[in-house]
A protein has these predicted regions:
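Structural signature of the two symmetry-related core transmembrane helices
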Residues: 80-94, 171-175, 276-289, 367
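Conserved MFS/SLC helix-loop-helix module at the cytosolic interface between two early adjacent transmembrane helices
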Residues: 63-100
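Helix-to-loop junctions at the C-terminal end of transmembrane segments
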Residues: 64-77, 161, 262-275, 357
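Helix-loop junctions at membrane interfaces in 12-TM secondary transporters
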Residues: 96-108, 292-303
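C-terminal transmembrane helical hairpin of 12-TM major facilitator-type secondary transporters
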Residues: 276-316
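Cytoplasmic helix-loop-helix junction between adjacent transmembrane helices
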Residues: 109-148
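Helix-loop boundary and gating motifs at the non-cytosolic
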Residues: 2-60, 209-254
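Intracellular juxtamembrane helix-capping segments at the cytosolic ends
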Residues: 117-130, 236, 313-326
């Protein structure tokens, strides 16, 4: 794989520091779910279902809050949003070890709304720092950074929770959120290009002028992508449990993450690549037959490699589509909607695929994940064709 495109992006001013900062910012986000689950189960004596309710409330809060935080960034810049979210996240996670379950359930949704938006911030900063011809490479690099954080963050959360205590782990997450917010506030990376910043500020555009059919299609496909990914993980875990090989779950997930990172590396390095919709279809189709070879564990891991090679490219292409379709003045809100779409997909994937497996077998979970992805892709295609037949009014301003 030629690495020159990545080297050229890394030579751009501000890019290496921003990628490193956003990688660190994502670590507490990737660790918080599993750490809070362990705390609810081990320290509060509740079941996994009770822990899942808190996770669901947090996810709903994040989905509701992401576009609102994005709008705040569009109107007032990065610092007010980072200060608000940083203080709220730090306070919530520092207090979490000392709250009863009922209180955690009540505050989970508002806390989710005010989570530091590391993902959308990373995409906005890269869009501001990187010229359009190089953005696919930059977004692919961001996806590889995300994969790495998902390999490290949960492992750190589990390690600290089991070797020390969940109280120490949750407190560490709170401190990390506060430190990340402080560094982001001090660094104040740009969220608009130099030309966009120099242009005179205009009134906020009504959402109907920029939330066009192609952008809605891109968001639907984003929901489908994370639906497939979450459904596949749940199906893989169920298959390993059914074959008595659940101890190999970590290895299988690691193989999936590495395959995704390799796919992202290739996607960002080649001169031309597939767009979001074909990648989404490829992601969905490749997971359909996995259930035919879901044991032993090493064969399952190998069967999941082709599908995961399309994972990071699909997510990177989603960011590329959203950044291209959203006007600069509402880019933060659009990136927030992208965050909401991905969280909705994650929230839908587990229960839908789980329901299918409860009434059949683990192998059908992979088929359900792929079929669901194709359904969302079909909706995206229909919206794109509607845009061709009936032009949506262009954004003004």
């Amino acid at each position: 794989v030629p690495l020159q495109p990545y080297l050229r992006v890394l030579r751009l001013p501000g890019v290496p520091a921003s990628i490193l900062l956003m990688f660190v910012a994502r670590l507490p986000m990737t660790a918080m779910g599993i750490t809070l689950t362990l705390h609810v189960v081990s320290e509060l004596g509740r079941g996994y279902g009770a822990a899942g309710l808190i996770g669901t409330a947090t996810t709903i809060g994040s989905a509701l809050g992401a576009p609102l935080i994005g709008r705040l960034i569009d109107r007032h810049g990065l610092r007010p949003a980072v200060a608000l979210c940083g203080l709220a996240s730090c306070a919530y996670w520092l207090s979490t070890p000392h709250l009863p379950y009922e209180a955690l359930l009540v505050v989970a949704l508002p806390a989710g709304m005010l989570t530091v938006p590391a993902g959308s911030l990373a995409r906005q900063v890269l869009t501001a720092l990187v010229p359009p011809p190089q953005r696919r490479t930059a977004y692919s690099m961001d996806m590889m950074s995300l994969e790495t954080s998902f390999m490290i963050g949960p492992a750190l959360g589990i390690l600290v929770s089991t070797q020390l205590s969940s109280t120490v782990a949750l407190t560490s997450i709170g401190i990390a959120f506060g430190a990340v917010a402080a560094v982001l506030y001090a660094a104040n990376p740009p969220v608009r290009t130099a030309a966009e910043s120099a242009a005179p500020r205009t009134a906020r555009q009504p959402i109907r002028t920029w939330l066009t059919a192609p952008l809605v299609a891109a968001l639907f496909i984003a929901v489908g992508a994370t639906f497939v990914l979450m459904g596949t993980e749940i199906a893989a875990l169920a298959a390993l449990r059914a074959s008595g090989e659940v101890e190999w779950t970590g290895v299988v997930i690691a193989v999936m993450a590495v395959a995704s990172a390799v796919g992202g590396l290739v996607h960002g390095a080649v001169p031309r690549s597939l767009s979001q919709l074909p990648l989404m279809v490829l992601l969905s189709v490749l997971v359909l037959p996995v259930g035919l070879v879901d044991q032993p564990w090493w064969l399952l891991a190998l069967a999941l490699v082709p599908m995961n090679l399309a994972c990071a490219p699909t997510l990177a292409a989603t960011t590329e589509a959203v950044s291209a379709l959203a006007p600069p003045g509402v880019r933060g809100e659009a990136m927030g909607l992208q965050d909401s779409a991905t969280r909705i997909g994650l929230a839908l994937g587990a229960p839908v695929v789980g329901f299918v497996m409860d009434h059949s077998a683990p192998g059908w979970g992979f088929a359900a994940a792929g079929a669901g992805g194709l359904l969302f892709a079909a909706v995206g295609l229909a919206l794109q064709r509607r845009r061709v037949r009936e032009p949506v009014p262009a954004a003004t301003g």
